[in-house]
């Protein structure tokens, strides 16, 4: 049994969940998180002042899977979550 964690873009959650279901993952924990990396944040205007928002909203998924499902689970997450743009991760 292995615990797999991935941080993905929020709009990819449904696709990842469906892909994991197809490979046999039956349980998943989802947490809303914020993070930053090479992908830069954005500026927002609040009460007439500009603020830089460095942390971007992400979703962390966690799943405990049997050893025989580890590779298929990772492949399913990567394939479903990838957008081809900055912020995809490694």
Question: Residue spans of the language-model regions?
Answer:
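Positively charged, small/polar-rich N-terminal and surface patches that mediate targeting and assembly
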Residues: 1-90
């Amino acid at each position: 049994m292995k615990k797999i964690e991935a941080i993905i873009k929020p709009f990819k959650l449904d696709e990842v969940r469906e892909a994991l279901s197809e490979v046999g993952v039956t349980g998943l924990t989802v947490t809303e998180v914020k993070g930053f990396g090479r992908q830069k944040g954005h500026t927002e205007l609040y009460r007439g002042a500009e603020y830089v928002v460095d942390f971007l909203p992400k979703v962390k998924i966690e799943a405990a899977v049997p050893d025989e499902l580890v590779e298929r689970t990772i492949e399913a997450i990567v394939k479903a979550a990838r957008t081809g743009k900055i912020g995809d991760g490694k």
